[in-house]
Amino acid sequence: MNIKASRIKELETLCKNIREEILRVVSKNGGHLSSTLGATEIIVAMHEVFDSKKDPFIFDVSHQSYAHKLLTGRWDKFDTLREFNGLCGYTKPSESEHDYFVAGHSSTSISLGVGAAKAIALKGEQNSRIPVIMIGDGSMTAGMVYEALNELGERKYPMVIILNDNEMSISKPIGAISRILSSAMASPFYQNFKKHTENFVDNFGDGARYIAKRMEESLKLITPGIMFEEMGIDYIGPVDGHNIASLIEILQKAKELKKPVIVHAQTLKGKGYEIAEGKDEKWHGVGPFDLDSGAASKKSSAKSATQIYAEALLHLAKNNDKIVGATAAMPSGTGLSELIELYPNRFWDVAIAEQHAVTSMAALAKEGFKPFCTIYSTFLQRGYDQVIHDTCLMNLPVVFALDRAGIVGEDGETHQGVFDVSFLRAIPNMTLFAPRDEKSFHQAMAFAAQYQFPCSLRYPRGSFTQTSLPESSPFELAKSQLLQSNKGDVLFIGYGNGVGRAYETSKLLEEKISILDLRFIKPLDKEMLRDMATKHNKWFIFSDSAKMGGVGSAILEFFADEKILHVELESFEYEDSFITHGKTKDVEESLGLLPAQLAQKVKALI
C-alpha cells in the first residue's frame, strides 16, 4: 500500500492534536490517560484502513477509546467526557453508531469478535465487513480471551486483532502469558538457543558469530508469535505502535489475508505527555490534575473506605499468619499493594482472573487459612459460579471484601456496584454485612477474621458519609445496632453507607425518628425487627444497592414469614435500571436520592 508522504504528515498532525485534546479534557474531568495516549496512532490507523460504520470496531474494556470518539463526530462534545449527561468514558452504542458494543469489563472483545464474525458469515458479508479488535496486554491475562482464541483458531473467521502491548494493565501484568508477550528473550527456547549457539560459535570465528547474531535477532521477533501460531492464528509483529505509516500498511495486509490475524503493536504508555510516559499505574486512571505539573487538583480530606480496609487487613495480617488474600489485577485500587509487598507469600495479585481468585481462595480456606478475596463489587459478577460452587457449597470461610459498592460515579453503567446484595443474598451459607463508618469497619473486619463460614462485606468508593451518630459496638452475628430511639411512628433502617444517608435525611425532618443500623442483611436481626414492629409502623429503608432482591426485599420476606401486616415499608434503593455515569451527587440527584429529596418523599408518606 503506497501512502503519500503528505497524507502521513497529516495523520501525524492529527495524532498530535488528538493527544492535546485528550490531555486538556482529562486534566479537567479525570479519566483514563496512559493507555489512551499510547493507543492514538493505532486508532487513527484503524480508521484509515477500516470503516467503523460497517466493520465492527471492538475495544476491549474500551477505556482507551477516546481517540475513536474524537474521530467519529464527538469532538465538539468531548468536553463533557464522563460528566452527567455527557459522553461516556467507554464505548456505548446509544451514543454513536460507530460504537459497536457496550464495554467496561475486561477481556470480552475477542468473544464479541467471534460472534460478530459468525453473523457476518451467516449474512454472506465476508467480502465487505471484518471485525477489528484492539486489546491491551493486561486483558490478555484473562481466561475468556483464550476461550475465544481457541474457537477462532479452529474456525478461521477473518478478523484483525490488534494487541496493544504497553506492558501495562492497571497494575503490572501478572503471570506466564504476560512474560511471553513482554519478553521474548526470557523464553527457555530463546535462552537455550543463545547458550548453545555461543558455545558452538566460539570455535568458528567472526563469521559464525555474525550469522548467529542475525539468527538471535530473528528469534526475538518469532518467539512471541509461537503461541498464537500454534492456536491457528496468524501473527504479525512486534511492530512500532507509534509509526502511523507502518501501522496502516500492516493493517491493510492483515485485512487482505481474510483470516484471523494478531498484529502485535508495542506502544509507550502516556505517549506525548512526558510526565506520564512509561510511568506505572498512577497514570492509568486519574482525577483532575494540573497539566503543567501533573499534580492532582484536589485531594479528599476524609479517609477512604479502601484505606480503612487496607489498614484493618494489615493489622489483622500482622497478628495472624493464617490470614491470606488475593485481588484480581487491582492491588492499588483495593489497597492491597502494601500487603503484597510485605507478605508476598500470603497476598497475591492473580491478574484479571476473578474466577481463579475465588476458587484458589476457597482451596486455601479448605487448608485452614483465612482468605480475604478483595474485589470490586462489579467484578465479583465475573466469579459468581465460583462463589456458589467452590465456596458456599463447601461452606468455606472465605471473606469477600467488596470495594466500590454502590454508585461509583464517572465510570458509569458497567462499574456501578449495586447488584452484590441481591446476587449474594440468594446463596445458601453466605453471610452478608456492612460497616457504616471507620470504627465499625474495623469491628466488621475483626468479626470477619474469626468467622468460620463464607461471608461478604461491602463498602463504598471514596469515604463513608460522615455522621455524629453514637459509636459502633462490636459486630455480633445477626445483631443490628439501634442508634437513635424515639416514640414516633417512623423508623429509618440503614445498611452500610445507607446509614449515613438515613441520618442526613432525618436531620431535615421535624418528626421524631428512630434510626437502626441493620448491619447484617443475612441473617437478619429478627428479634430487633420484631421489637421495632411493635413500636413503629412506618419504615424507610436506606441502602446503596439494587431494590430488587435487596434490603427492602429481605425485610418484606421477613414480614411475610412473621405475618406482620400493619407496617408500611418504603425502600430507597436503586430501581430496576442501569445507572448512568457522572459525579455521584449528580447521579443520586437524578435518582431522587439526595437527603433533601428523600426528606420530601418521607414527608409525603407520613
Swiss-Prot record:
GO molecular-function terms, A-Z: 1-deoxy-D-xylulose-5-phosphate synthase activity; magnesium ion binding; thiamine pyrophosphate binding
Any GO BP: isopentenyl diphosphate biosynthetic process, methylerythritol 4-phosphate pathway
Binding-site list for Mg(2+): D137, N166
Keywords carried by this UniProt record: Isoprene biosynthesis, Magnesium, Metal-binding, Thiamine biosynthesis, Thiamine pyrophosphate, Transferase
Binding site for thiamine diphosphate: H63, G104, H105, S106, G138, S139, N166, Y273, E354
Catalytic activity: D-glyceraldehyde 3-phosphate + pyruvate + H(+) = 1-deoxy-D-xylulose 5-phosphate + CO2
Glycosyltransferase in keyword set: no
Biological pathway: Metabolic intermediate biosynthesis; 1-deoxy-D-xylulose 5-phosphate biosynthesis; 1-deoxy-D-xylulose 5-phosphate from D-glyceraldehyde 3-phosphate and pyruvate: step 1/1
Entry's Gene Ontology cellular component terms: cytosol
Transmembrane residue ranges: none
EC primary class: transferase
Gene3D superfamilies: 3.40.50.920, 3.40.50.970
Origin: domain of life: Bacteria
Family: Belongs to the transketolase family. DXPS subfamily.
Function: Catalyzes the acyloin condensation reaction between C atoms 2 and 3 of pyruvate and glyceraldehyde 3-phosphate to yield 1-deoxy-D-xylulose-5-phosphate (DXP).
HAMAP family the record matches: DXP_synth
Protein name: 1-deoxy-D-xylulose-5-phosphate synthase
Organism expressing this protein natively: Sulfurimonas denitrificans (strain ATCC 33889 / DSM 1251)
